[in-house]
Each structure stands twice: as structure tokens, then as C-alpha cells.
């Protein structure tokens, strides 16, 4: 039963209930700075702690002590936006006017392009490997000592380990956090908001078991690509990619990839500005045991000199053509 005399602390990195009568200058450990998202990294501006994994980043312990506060923060997205990602001089900025050589593509307003989820298939081998590994992780966690107060690592859950088995259902988001064009949402339920605080308060869409421990798994991955028979194929080599967290979308000119791998303990976020146009509805994704294969149907039958559009190289080729 909730103690109505206690208030909710809205400091970033805290989120605990507190008694106003016992709120001194050492009561709260939090992040006074705002969140900052750049090149797949999630960063706290106050201490520069960063991670590509949203859950790991959210669980970084605060860097400052002070009193708890029950005042809800203003839209901190606007504050974070003041920080420049690339403060180039105006004359150094390259203006992108196309994804290919001039005249090769029909003119298209980028703001009107609609992203589509690519069809995802999972191989039987990948399904079996995931089930086996997750069972091993669950059994290991139950037998290992867990520190009292350890937070649940599932996205959207703030439950702390209290010494019992914590068998009550864990309401959480199994998907990955997506940040795109000012919007924040979970790939598992797609409830979008521009307010970071509202995003964090979204109730989980799935019930399951709490996860009080992170298992150390290598988070490295590599990628390559090739073209054959009218398809351009991107291979992302990583073990234990979780299908339910995969958010792979394309608007025909770009592809965005966000998913958890390492059986849920690492994440990858990739963005591709493609050299030429593809057909999303005729493209597909195959999640295997050790790699994720993204096959993109080419709209034009021409060969691709490279996977990504390069403003400098393609502008130069345009002039020489």
C-alpha cells in the first residue's frame, strides 16, 4: 500500500518516494544536467556519462547530492537542444540536394516521405538460441547474490530489489528507445511524445519477470554490404539479436536500424542515407543466430558504387558526368 504522506521526487536519476520531513541536503542523488542525444549515444550533460544502451544510461547513478524535489521538470528537450552538435561555420556546411547524381531521382520532398517497418523473419536457429540463453541467464540470476536496492534493469520499471524474489509482475518496455526528429518512443508500442519526462513516465506495455542484474556480454558488432539480383543487402554481425526489440524502418531513401543484441545486454543504432532509392514494401529483414540480414529491393537496376550517399563524392561525379 502506498504511503500517501510521501511525495514523488522528479529529479533525473532519482525518482524515489520521499518524506518531506526527512528531506535534507544529502537525501537525493541525481543528475542536475539534461539529457543529450548524439550519434546513438545518450549523455548526461552534467557529468558526461554516456552509453549507447538506454537502460544502462538511465541507471547511471546521479553525480550530485541535494534535496528531493516533487516539482515536475519543464520540457527539458528544449534545454538540451541548445547544445550544438556540429558548430560549423556557415560556409563549411554542405547543402544536401539529392541522394544520387542530378536527374537520376525524381524530386521528392523529404518531409513527405513516410517510414515503413520492414518485414522481419526469424530463423529457427535464432529462436532456439535466444530461448536457451535467456533461460540460462534467468537461472544464473536466481542463484547469484543481488544487492538490496538494486534497480530492475527492464526499461520503464523502477522497482528495487528488496531481498525477496520479487515475483510480482514487472511492467516494462521490451523494445528499444527511439529518438527521431524530436520524438521519443519505444519500438514495442510506438506511443510517441516530444517531452522527455512524459516519455520516461510511459507505463510498460508488457508484463514479465524483473531483471536485477546485467550480464556482461561483448557488445561489439560489425557490418558489411553487397548487391546482387536487384537487391542491396546489409549484414549486421551480432549474436543474440532480440526480434521483439528490432525497429528497422525505411522511407525508400534512408534506413534506420535500432535493436538489442547480446541477448538483451547491448544495443545498436544505425542510420543509412542510401546511395539510391529502394522499395520498402518489397524489402525484408532476416534475424539469424549470428547476424541480421537487411535485404533492400532496388528501385533502379543500376549498380551502386557505395552503400551511402556521399555529398562530396556524388557532387563531384555530378560535375564530371
Curated annotation (Swiss-Prot):
User: What sections of the protein cross the membrane?
Assistant: none
Report the protein's function: Regulates centrosome duplication. Controls the secretion of the tyrosine kinase receptor let-23/EGFR from the endoplasmic reticulum and is required for the localization of let-23/EGFR to the plasma membrane of vulval precursor cells. It thus plays a role in positively regulating let/EGFR signaling, and anchor cell and vulval precursor cell alignment. Plays a role in vulval development and morphogenesis.
Query: In which residues is Zn(2+) 1 bound?
Result: 9, 14, 28, 68
Q: What is this protein called?
A: Cysteine and histidine-rich domain-containing protein 1
InterPro entries (UniProt xref): CHORD_dom, CHRD1, CS_dom, HSP20-like_chaperone
Keyword flag Metal-binding? yes
Q: What happens biologically when this protein's gene is inactivated, per the record? A: RNAi-mediated knockdown results in reduced fertility and in high levels of embryonic lethality with none of the unhatched embryos reaching the comma stage of development. Among the 40% of embryos that hatch, 98% reach adulthood, but have a reduced brood size, and the remaining 2% do not survive beyond the L1 larval stage. Surviving adults have defects in vulval development, whereby 3-5% have a protruding vulva (Pvl) phenotype and 1% have a multivulva (Mvl) phenotype.
Q: Name all CHORD domain ranges.
A: 9-68, 152-210
Biological process (GO), any one: centrosome duplication
Q: Which GO terms describe its molecular function?
A: zinc ion binding
Q: Which Pfam families match?
A: CHORD, CS
PROSITE patterns recorded: CHORD, CS
Protein residues bound to Zn(2+) 4: 173, 188-189, 205
Residues given in the record as Zn(2+) 2 binding sites: 31, 46-47, 63
Q: Which residues form the CS domain?
A: 218-308
Positions annotated to bind Zn(2+) 3: 152, 157, 170, 210
Keyword Metal-binding attributed: yes
Keywords in UniProt for this one? Metal-binding, Repeat, Zinc
